[in-house]
């Protein structure tokens, strides 16, 4: 792979700590979610950050496919739901559901565009055959 961009973020304190990008743009406290034993859900957590990255990246890939196909699709929207759970071997794993809305086109065209985006999105390529990713497509 020819690297086009690299970023760097440092974490201290694990799930109950702090993350900061080298350029200082991203800097926030992270905490364990309540459902995993944390105090509350008032902070960001690793799953939330993963969901944000995947949603933004997938939406960019989708818009690239829309431009390439010269589709008449309207403004797209991607909602990423990221779950964490225990695996059979005692470790932990993630699962993702991407709810993707592609307005202004038929459902068939929307599904085709989403499948194309899923093939080029870096997050999709990184997760393929590693975690379950479910794509739910709407066109309203």
Which residue stretches match the model-derived regions?
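Extended beta-strand/beta-hairpin segments
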Residues: 1-52, 59-140
């Amino acid at each position: 792979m020819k690297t086009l961009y690299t970023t760097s973020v440092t974490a201290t304190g694990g799930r109950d700590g702090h993350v900061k990008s080298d350029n200082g743009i991203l800097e926030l406290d992270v905490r364990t979610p309540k459902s995993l034993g944390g105090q509350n859900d008032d902070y960001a957590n690793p799953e939330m950050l993963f969901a944000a990255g995947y949603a933004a990246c997938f939406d960019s890939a989708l818009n690239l496919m829309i431009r390439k196909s010269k589709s008449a699709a309207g403004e797209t929207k991607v909602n990423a739901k990221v779950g964490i759970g225990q695996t059979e071997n005692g470790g932990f794993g993630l699962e993702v559901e991407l709810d993707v809305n592609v307005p202004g086109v038929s459902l068939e065209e929307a599904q085709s565009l989403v499948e194309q985006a899923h093939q080029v999105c870096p997050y999709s390529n990184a997760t393929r055959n590693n975690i379950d990713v479910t794509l739910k497509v709407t066109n309203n």
